[in-house]
Amino acid sequence: MVFFDPVYRQIQFENDEDGKPAGKYPDVIHGISVTEDNSIEVNLFAPDAKSVSVVLENGTEELLYRSKKNDGYWEKTIGNPAEGFNYVTFMVNGTPVVNPAAPVGFGYNRAVNFAEVPERNFSWHELKKTDHGQIHIHYSCDGDGQVSMNYVYTPAGYGEDNCDTGRVCVLECAADERNFCWIHQGKIANIMDNLSGEGRIKGIMIIMADSTISDDIIGNITAIYGIKDSAQKEWFKKGDNESWTSCRHRFVNFMCGIQ
């Protein structure tokens, strides 16, 4: 499951003196945190482990050390990580695991932790004060009876005041990822909101798809919005070995280029 809430705040169920529920949210040690100098601090609770390491997206493996301050924890500070989105795979005794106290994304056909390191010269993917569009979920059934779920982004005011231009862009994710990655890891909604807010683009609907989406499903989705099958569609595909950081940059250039 992909989630982006503060995972370090986990509820602790307790009762007060009268026996009434009095749950609280104690802070636990962050599994992944980014420091002011953009280093990555990693922590994992694994008291019985013989070895713990993390493998970064560039393939570098960093060994963690037993914490002298926190019993059962392994820790390390990693300097000079790549800016942007970074997959971080925790390894315990040589086996990949998911750290429940760190953000979780999806890649390599499995759940995987990640770190988001601020970029100095790129902020289109960040949440900003601007008009925000909407994300819709559409369920479709193909000829084989398989039900699929696809995500659609429409900009603020879509369908009003001539904002609807009838233009569509289909995003196709990498083979080892899923269409929801466009929202959580690609930050497509934020990028589109910010580009629209600055007048760089206007009235483009985005369909976020897996690599197996069919033309029939695309047609069914666009028909809901009154868009004809003959309407021109732009296609943008994430490379199988492309980082999400690179994909975000390329997507911004792509969208500005088709205006």
Predicted ranges, named:
Residues F3-A22, D27-V28, V34-S53, E57-E61, ...:
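Non-catalytic cap/lid and distal C-terminal segments of serine-dependent acyl enzymes
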